[in-house]
Each structure stands twice: as structure tokens, then as C-alpha cells.
Amino acid sequence: MASRKPNPDQLGLLLSQEPAAKRARRILCGVDEAGRGPLAGPVTAAAVVLNPRKPIKGLADSKILTARKREALYDEIVEKALAWHVAEATVEEIDRINILHATMLAMQRAVQGVAALGTLPDLVQVDGNRCPQVAFAVEAIVKGDALVPAISAASILAKVTRDRQLAALHIEFPLYGFDVHAGYGTPQHLAAIDLHGVTPHHRRSFAPVRRALEGMSAISIETVAAGSAWDD
């Protein structure tokens, strides 16, 4: 069961009243996600507790880093962090409970994964304006991926992991360009859906995919009707 969480103003006051030495010893867990907007693939979340004795240079919002830089930082984060865990919510879960709740679920799983390793955060800091239900104090930080190093690290782990998943998906479905757009609704991706249809990895609750399915159903009905007329 999640503990009662103070509101952001209360939390900021509590933190400001703590002695500096105590704040320095706090175990802070950064959390971020990747893949809320795409039409295909899971939504991925990561939780990271950095080691203050092993600083990592160059941490930043994963979206402004090159793929090469993200990959290099991924390896360094995994090596130096006190604890980290990457989790996801599947396409089926996204379609069943919606993308917002699925994102919160993935974040919750990521934090639980860190705790399962024996690292219990004093504070979980989440990018954005919403917090998952976790058994620790938690705060949301808008643009946290650019402001809080642990959240930056989490954003990098989440994005690199998801990009690798979509690159692997491209091998299975090479006609869709998943290795290029990572499932986002680019013109190339939308054209591929129109031409080749929807895969099991597409989010049927998302409007462009839903419209494509409805169009395919209409074509099927017309084809059956035309066949019946021909038989008559």
C-alpha cells in the first residue's frame, strides 16, 4: 500500500528544513518514461538511484542527446548507479487501461524493481506532473529530466531500452520502419499501416490505428458484399 504523500509545497518545506548533511545522505530515486506517444510498442519506464561517489558527466534529457551519446551513457549508468531497474507496460495493458495509467504502472514497476534489489528510496522523483502509486515519498518535477540527474539517467535508460526493443521489432516487421521512428506516428509509419495493415504490436486504442482497423473492416465488408452479389 502506498504511503500518504505530502503535497509538493509541504515536501519542499520539509526538505528545506533538513540539515544539509542529512539531505546529502538521502537516497533519491529518479524515474522517467519513454514511449507514451507512439502508435506501437510498450511504454517503458526506468528508476535509477545514482551513486554520489561515482559521478556521471553529461547526464541530460535523453531527447536532446544523440543516439551514440545515449548508448555510452547507458553503459556508464548501469555500471555506476547504486541501483536501477527498467520496466514496461505492454500494448495490451495500454489498450485496456489507457496510456496514462499504463505509464504510471510501468513507473510503479520500475520503482518496485529498485526496492526489490534492496535499495529503498527516501524520495522518488518523477518527471512530469503526475506520480505513480509507490510505497515511498514521491514528488513530480516538471522538466525533471533536464533538472534532476537521477531523472536524466532514468530517461536515458528508458529510451535506450525502448529503442532497442523497436529495433528488434523491425527485424520481425521490416516493412514498418520501427528502427527509424520507434513506433511514432510519422508519415512513413502511417503510410505503412495503410499499405500493410496493423501488427499485434500496434496500440488499437490510439486513433490512427483505430481508424486503420475501421477502414480495414469496411473494406472487408464491401468485399464480402461484392462477392455475394457476384454469386447471385
Swiss-Prot record:
Which GO molecular function entries does the Swiss-Prot or TrEMBL record give? manganese ion binding; RNA binding; RNA-DNA hybrid ribonuclease activity
Q: What does this protein do?
A: Endonuclease that specifically degrades the RNA of RNA-DNA hybrids.
Any one cellular-component term (Gene Ontology): ribonuclease H2 complex
Please name the InterPro entries in this protein's record. RNase_HII, RNase_HII/HIII, RNase_HII/HIII_dom, RNaseH-like_sf, RNaseH_sf
GO biological process assignments: DNA replication, removal of RNA primer; mismatch repair
Tell me which domain of life the UniProt entry assigns to the organism this sequence originates from.
Bacteria
The reply to whether Nucleus figures as a keyword in the UniProt entry is no
Which cofactor(s) are needed, names only? Mn(2+); Mg(2+)
Q: Which residues bind a divalent metal cation?
A: D32, E33, D127
Disulfide pattern: none
Which residue numbers delimit the RNase H type-2 domain?
Answer: 26-218
Task: Please list the reactions this protein catalyses.
Answer: Endonucleolytic cleavage to 5'-phosphomonoester
HAMAP family linked to this entry: RNase_HII_B (MF_00052_B)
- Kindly list the places in or outside the cell where this protein is found, as annotated in its UniProt entry: Cytoplasm
Q: What is this protein called?
A: Ribonuclease HII
Name the Pfam families for this protein.
Answer: RNase_HII
Q: What's the Enzyme Commission number for this chain?
A: 3.1.26.4
Q: Which family does it belong to?
A: Belongs to the RNase HII family.
What does this protein's record comment on cofactor binding? Manganese or magnesium. Binds 1 divalent metal ion per monomer in the absence of substrate. May bind a second metal ion after substrate binding.
